[in-house]
Amino acid sequence: MTATAPVKTEYEAVIGLETHVQLGTATKIFSNASTEFGADPNTHIDPVVLGLPGTLPVLNQKVLEYAVKAGLALNCQIAPYSKFDRKQYFYPDLPKNYQISQYDLPIAEHGWIEIEVAEKGKEPYTKKIGVTRLHMEEDAGKLVHAGSDRLAGSTHSLVDYNRAGVALAEIVSEPDLRTGKEAAEYAQELRRIMRYLGVSDGNMAEGSLRCDVNISIRPKGTEKFGTKVEIKNMNSFNAIQRAIEFEIERQIRCLETGEPIVQETRLWDEGKQVTKSMRSKEGSSDYRYFPEPDLGPIEVSETQRETWRSELPELPAQKRHRYAEQYGLSAYDARVLTDEKSTADYYEATVAAGADAKQAANWLMGDIAAYVNANKLLVSDLPLQPQDLAELVNLIEAGTISGKIAKEILPELLEKGGSPKAIVEAKGLTQISDPAQIEALVDELLAAHPTELEQFRAGKTKLQGFFVGQLMKKTGGRVDPKLSNQILNQKLKG
């Protein structure tokens, strides 16, 4: 669906995200049932999860710690006093027919994060996005509808309660986002922060991070919000961006044609790349919230809060800034290297072992990244240790080997690890950098190709590439490129 350019310039989107982050605790939020992903259906359940008579929930203290740390990392104010509430709704994936959540007294609120947005053909910019609140709640079970992707049209439904009771942190943003690109970047930055903290793996494919989008359209320059639509079922950051871009076009078309925009929940159809109406949107009054009577209030002392704050790691934005300042890296390089904490840790260990910061970055973002991505690994999984990568970089810097030789031995290092210096010595790959030795090799080469030499001196200068190639072939790429080019130039010109 495509709108004309003038129409696009008349409206702006107002976008907020509700992000559910599964907290990586070993047991569930209110019971000792396991949270392991991928187990047989209905094997990680217990009487508390199923809401059987006589059972009482007990708050997992690790969940509270993770929620507070996440709130602190999002620059939120941590509530010294908060509570749990019952959110009532009747659906088969909720065995108790209510969800234990937090309503009017969340554990954290009034925060923000800063995102960096780089769109093709546009100047990159940073933007501060408000975080309205972060609250704790339990996850629901999972429904599988036979014969359809939703309840309507299915012949029957199966329910798996393994996910029920898994701890969630729901993070609600302010409606500060304006484009699909901004929303996708916000979601990615949230995931980076959660992974750096170690409170969640943020795996969207496994449902560890799920985003719902709230979006409305209004004429530019006005403050009044349009009719809000919620979008669900986006399982990647690209899907978030595409769903928003489609929905912006759809809502603009509605306004232009006089068709009413309905307040509803819509599903993103990945196959057709469209949003589809799912149901009318409930208001908070539909859930009949009231305080959870089986759980006491949550109190976080100043001492406890500051103890948890002191345990926070350096976060992605802080690392990006430091890499630019300390290592002189570009914003792009700093962003790539800090995307995964394991990559950042590996990079810093490589530099600490003596490697040049820029050269180490180039290797990690180039050949090593290609290998890691192709094999679906993390850098930390590699047999090649940071100190060995530093040794490889230093061998090149010292002129012991060429970059070409380094690339030739890299596959072995990535697969088996070991000392680059030892491999170079064992295979006789040390770079030839003695001028007298190179001069002798060049003399032999020119003597072996008199015809080409004559043609070169007659004006066919493109043949210089032929001689360079032959010299590299003759030495197995071991000859010092810069020095050999100088000597070859001198000899060719007679």
Curated annotation (Swiss-Prot):
<dbReference type="Pfam" id="PF02934">
    <property type="entry name" value="GatB_N"/>
</dbReference>
<dbReference type="GO" id="GO:0005524">
    <property type="term" value="F:ATP binding"/>
</dbReference>
<comment type="similarity">
    <text>Belongs to the GatB/GatE family. GatB subfamily.</text>
</comment>
<dbReference type="InterPro" id="IPR017958">
    <property type="entry name" value="Gln-tRNA_amidoTrfase_suB_CS"/>
</dbReference>
<comment type="subunit">
    <text>Heterotrimer of A, B and C subunits.</text>
</comment>
<keyword id="KW-0648">Protein biosynthesis</keyword>
<dbReference type="InterPro" id="IPR003789">
    <property type="entry name" value="Asn/Gln_tRNA_amidoTrase-B-like"/>
</dbReference>
<dbReference type="GO" id="GO:0006412">
    <property type="term" value="P:translation"/>
</dbReference>
<dbReference type="GO" id="GO:0070681">
    <property type="term" value="P:glutaminyl-tRNAGln biosynthesis via transamidation"/>
</dbReference>
<dbReference type="InterPro" id="IPR014746">
    <property type="entry name" value="Gln_synth/guanido_kin_cat_dom"/>
</dbReference>
<dbReference type="InterPro" id="IPR023168">
    <property type="entry name" value="GatB_Yqey_C_2"/>
</dbReference>
<comment type="function">
    <text>Allows the formation of correctly charged Asn-tRNA(Asn) or Gln-tRNA(Gln) through the transamidation of misacylated Asp-tRNA(Asn) or Glu-tRNA(Gln) in organisms which lack either or both of asparaginyl-tRNA or glutaminyl-tRNA synthetases. The reaction takes place in the presence of glutamine and ATP through an activated phospho-Asp-tRNA(Asn) or phospho-Glu-tRNA(Gln).</text>
</comment>
<keyword id="KW-0067">ATP-binding</keyword>
<dbReference type="InterPro" id="IPR018027">
    <property type="entry name" value="Asn/Gln_amidotransferase"/>
</dbReference>
<dbReference type="GO" id="GO:0050566">
    <property type="term" value="F:asparaginyl-tRNA synthase (glutamine-hydrolyzing) activity"/>
</dbReference>
<dbReference type="GO" id="GO:0050567">
    <property type="term" value="F:glutaminyl-tRNA synthase (glutamine-hydrolyzing) activity"/>
</dbReference>
<protein>
    <recommendedName>
        <fullName>Aspartyl/glutamyl-tRNA(Asn/Gln) amidotransferase subunit B</fullName>
        <ecNumber>6.3.5.-</ecNumber>
    </recommendedName>
</protein>
<dbReference type="Pfam" id="PF02637">
    <property type="entry name" value="GatB_Yqey"/>
</dbReference>
<dbReference type="InterPro" id="IPR006075">
    <property type="entry name" value="Asn/Gln-tRNA_Trfase_suB/E_cat"/>
</dbReference>
<dbReference type="InterPro" id="IPR017959">
    <property type="entry name" value="Asn/Gln-tRNA_amidoTrfase_suB/E"/>
</dbReference>
<dbReference type="InterPro" id="IPR004413">
    <property type="entry name" value="GatB"/>
</dbReference>
<dbReference type="InterPro" id="IPR042114">
    <property type="entry name" value="GatB_C_1"/>
</dbReference>
<keyword id="KW-0547">Nucleotide-binding</keyword>
<keyword id="KW-0436">Ligase</keyword>
